[in-house]
Amino acid sequence: MIFSEQILFSLGAEVLQYEVNELIFSDGQRPNYYYQVSMGAVKLTKDRENGTETILSIFLSGECFAETFLFDNKAYPFNAVAMELYKIFRVPGERFVYFAKNTQESLLKLYCYNADKLSFY
């Protein structure tokens, strides 16, 4: 788990539940939240002009996704979709960015997590 439940709740996290194939956020939407999987799996997808869907990445329990978009406020270039019955922590983006910028340990965790993700590509 990237950040403990205690830390997430101290930042105002909500726990949301999603059904299979339910959209969490869509391509073009601005980032407003930090997302961390509590239970289940989520996929990041890109819809193609020919009607097909490309899976870009899959995230499992304890992992966060699309967090880097909070730091530059660029729109998401993909969709996030629940793959199975799914619970997620959702933290308001401004609170999470403030926490990350002001807590050296949190930035180190994010850097290490992202470096680990990139090592699989």
Regions found by a protein language model. Name each.
Residues 95-121:
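A small-molecule sensor/coupling module
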Residues 1, 44, 118-121:
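Hydrophobic recognition helices of helix-based DNA-binding modules
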Residues 22-85:
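Cyclic nucleotide-binding regulatory domains
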Residues 1-22, 64-65, 69-74, 102:
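Cyclic nucleotide-binding regulatory module and flanking cytosolic helices
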Residues 25, 89, 97:
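Nucleotide phosphate-binding site architecture
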Residues 9, 81-88, 112:
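Short, surface-exposed, charge-dense and proline/glycine-enriched linear segments
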